[in-house]
UniProtKB/Swiss-Prot annotation:
The keyword Ribonucleoprotein applies. GO terms for cellular component: cytosolic large ribosomal subunit. It holds the Pfam family Ribosomal_L30. It comes from Nitrobacter hamburgensis (strain DSM 10229 / NCIMB 13809 / X14). CDD domains: Ribosomal_L30. The keyword Ribosomal protein applies. InterPro entries: Ribo_uL30_ferredoxin-like_sf, Ribosomal_uL30_bac-type, Ribosomal_uL30_ferredoxin-like. This is Large ribosomal subunit protein uL30. One of its GO terms (molecular function) is structural constituent of ribosome.
Length: 64
């Protein structure tokens, strides 16, 4: 029986206006594009790296 994949919920708390293009692209990669949006993502090293890159724009709500 396979283990369930761990997930992480991330909410965008600040705007992407006047941010570097790479930070905007990272938000799109995290499935976030508006303040208040919440995305449930798989908890992988790649996702953690993307969150770290835009940590000033998002917050982690829940880690399951």
């Amino acid at each position: 029986m396979a283990k369930a994949a761990k997930t992480i919920k991330v909410e965008q708390t600040r705007s992407a206006i006047r941010r570097q293009h790479s930070q905007r692209s990272t938000l799109v990669g995290l499935k976030l594009n508006k303040i208040g949006r919440v995305a449930e993502l798989q908890d992988t090293p790649e996702t953690r790296g993307m969150i770290a890159k835009v940590q000033h724009l998002v917050r982690v709500i829940d880690e399951t």
